[in-house]
Amino acid sequence: MAPLQFQPLASQPTPAFWAALAAHKLNHLKLDDSHLPITAQIEPAKRVLINKERVDDTADVGIDGSLVVGGDAFEAERGRLPPNAVSVTGTLKIFNTIEEFKDTSAKKRLFDDLVSQMLESFDTDRPVLNPFLLVTFADLKKYVYHYWFAFPALVSSPAWVMDGEFMPVDEIEDIRKLAQSHFQHNTTAFLLKGAAPHLSAAPLSSCSTFYDKTQSEMVTVVFHDTSSLPSNPGWGLRNVLYYLSAKHGITSLVVICLREGSSSTQASLSLSSPPSTAPAKPPQAVGWERHPSGKLSPRVADLGPMMDPTRLAAQAVDLNLKLIKWRLLPALDLDKISGTRCLLLGAGTLGCYVARILMGWGVRNITLVDSSTVSYSNPVRQPLFTFSDCLNGGLPKAPTAAKKLQEIFPGVNAQGVVLGIPMPGHPISSSDDAVEKDVAKLEALVKSHDAVFLLMDSRESRWLPTVLGRKWGKVVVNAALGFDSFLVMRHGAGAGAGARRIQSDEGGVGEKGLGCYYCNDIVAPTDSLSDRTLDQMCTVTRPGVAPIAAAMAVELLISVLQHPLGVHAPAERPDTAETSTSTKTSPLGCVPHQLRGQMYQWKTQIVEGEAFDRCTGCSDYVLNEYETNGFAFLRRVFNEKDYLEKVTGLDELYRESEKVIEGMEGLDWDSEGEE
C-alpha cells in the first residue's frame, strides 16, 4: 500500500505585512538581526462552484488554504480572525545583507534549531505542531523583499497509509462548533470522541488519558486542513501523526480533515508496519517551500510598482534620515524636525538653498515670502528657478519656488506668499492701509510657524521680523552675505528661565541672554537701498558663499531643535561641549550663537554676543512700545529716522558719550607722571 502523500502548505505574505516589516526594521530593529516571533493565520481549504459556458453547467473547484501573514504579524494582540482560521506563531529572521541571506548554512541552522525546539515541546502539554520559519532580506530603498518560507515537517518511519478511502463527514457542523467553542482559533488539531450531540474534545497531549482503553475507543483527530485534494490531506497533518505515534504510541486512528463548507472528509489511517524497537534516531525533517517554478529557491516580492509614487517618494525621503538613527545618532528626534513649520522670509538665493536643505532634513511645512519676480540673472544662482520663469516679466518668486518644491517632492506642504515687508527708514503714507494689512499678515505668518529664517537682501528688512519673532518666542535664524563672507546666527529668546542658564564663568555670555542681529548696533536701522550704484544694488558675492551659509543656517536650526532647551539653548563652543558633563546637549553637537565665515582666509569663527538692553530689535523698550501702540508705533518707525533711537535711549547714550569725549579733550595722553 502506497504511503500517504501530503499537500504542501503555501505561504501568502500580504503587502501589508511587507509594509509592517519595513517599518519594524527601519524604526525598531535597525541593525539588530536576531530572529523574532511573528504571528500568522492558517486558513483551511474550500470548494466553490463556478459557472461554465452554459447556465446549467457548473464545476466544483477546490481552493487550497494557505498561511496568511498580515500587517498585524508583529502585534501581540491580533485582530479578529476569519471564522475557521487558526492563529499560529513562527520565527522571522531579517538578514542585513543579501550575501547573508544567500548563505545556505545560515538558513540550515535556523531550520534545524526550529526542528529541535519543536521536538523539545513534545515533552510538554503544549506541543508545537505548526511552526514556520521566514527568512528574508529587505531592500528598503527599492521595496524589494527576498524571502523563503519553511514549514518543518517530521518524516514518520514507518510511513502512514490509508485504510480505505476519504469519505464525507456527517457531523461536520457540530465538530466545527465544538472547535470554535473549545479552542478559539488557537489550535490546528485536537482529539474527538463520542457522537452527536454528545461530542467531546481534548488537546492532543491528553491522548493517553482521553480515551477509555477498556472500550477500545478509536483515536480520532480533527485538524484544520489546507488541502483541497480528495485523497491528500494538508502538510500540517504530518507533525500531528508523528507526535501521536512517537509520544503516545498510536499506530492507527481516524482523521477528520476540517475544511470550509461541506468539503470536509475523513479516513482511517495506520502505520504501514510496526514501529521499530531499535534505539530512536533524530527524525528527518523537510519543509522548505518550493518556488512556483518547482525549484527549491527563494522568492521575491517587488512592491515598488504597486505603491503610489507620492507615498513611495515620502518613504524614500524618510529612509535616509531614519538610517542615521541606526548607528550614528540613535537619539535623533526626526518627528520633531518633520513637524517644525518653517517660514522663509526671502525666496532668493539663500531662500532657495535653505528650502532644499530643509526638505533634505524631512521638514514637511515650508512657507516662502517674497515680493519680487524672477529675473534673468536668478536661475543660475537660485536653484528653484529656470529660464522659463523669467519670461514675460518674470513669475512671482515665492509661489513659483513653492510650486518647484512640490514638483521635487509632492509630499511637502509648500506655500508661497507675495508680501512686501515694511522697513525702518522707508516712509509710508499716513493713509496707507495696505501697509497695515501687510504687517498683520506678516505677524500672522510668524505666529503660525515654529521657525523663522531671515534671508532678505537688506539690513532694515530684517527688523520687523526680528521684533515679531521675539514677541512670539520663535526660533529666528538669520543669514547674511558679503562678497566673500557670511554671517549665520540665531536670535536670543530673551531673559527667560532657559536663557538665563547660559554659563558665564566658564566662557559663556553671562545672564543677559543671547543677542539678535541688531544688538551690536548703536544706531537704528535705516534706508540702505537708496543712492546705490549698480554693483551695490545687485547681490555681488562669490557664488559658493550662499549655499555654504544656507547649509549652516539649516544645520543650526536642526541643532537647536534637538537641544533639550530648544530656543533657550545656551551658546556653546566645540571645546566646552566636549568637556561638558551636562545631559542637556544636542545629539548633533554644540549649538553656537553666531558663525562668521571668511572665504578669503577659509575660516569660520564661532562668536557669542550678549543681548543689548537698548537694542533696536529685541529690547524690552521696543517690545513694550509695540505691544502698547501697535501699528501706530510702527508707522513712526517707518517714517521717522531717529524714532527707534529715542524709544530705546540710544540717543541719550550717544549724548552721554559725547560729553565724556568732550571732557577728555584737555587731557595730555602723552605726558608721564612723575615719581
From Swiss-Prot:
GO MF terms, alphabetically ordered: Atg12 activating enzyme activity; Atg8 activating enzyme activity; identical protein binding
Entry coiled-coil feature ranges: none
Single GO cellular component term: cytoplasm
Entry text on domains: The GxGxxG motif is important for the function, possibly through binding with ATP.
Chain ranges for the short sequence motif GXGXXG motif as given in the UniProt record: 346-351
Region described as Disordered: spans on this chain: 268-293
Known role: E1-like activating enzyme involved in the 2 ubiquitin-like systems required for cytoplasm to vacuole transport (Cvt) and autophagy. Activates ATG12 for its conjugation with ATG5 and ATG8 for its conjugation with phosphatidylethanolamine. Both systems are needed for the ATG8 association to Cvt vesicles and autophagosomes membranes. Autophagy is essential for maintenance of amino acid levels and protein synthesis under nitrogen starvation.
Keyword Transport: yes
Keywords from the named record: Autophagy, Cytoplasm, Protein transport, Transport, Ubl conjugation pathway
Description of how the protein assembles with itself and partners: Homodimer.
Pfam families: ATG7_N, ThiF
Family of this protein: Belongs to the ATG7 family.
Protein name: Ubiquitin-like modifier-activating enzyme ATG7
Cell compartment(s), UniProt: Cytoplasm; Preautophagosomal structure
InterPro entries from the UniProt entry: Atg7, Atg7_N, Atg7_N_1, Atg7_N_2, ThiF/MoeB/HesA, ThiF_NAD_FAD-bd, Ubiquitin-activating_enz
SUPFAM superfamilies named among the record's database cross-references: Activating enzymes of the ubiquitin-like proteins
Location of the active site: C538
Broad class of where this protein is predominantly found: cytoplasm
GO biological process, one term: protein transport
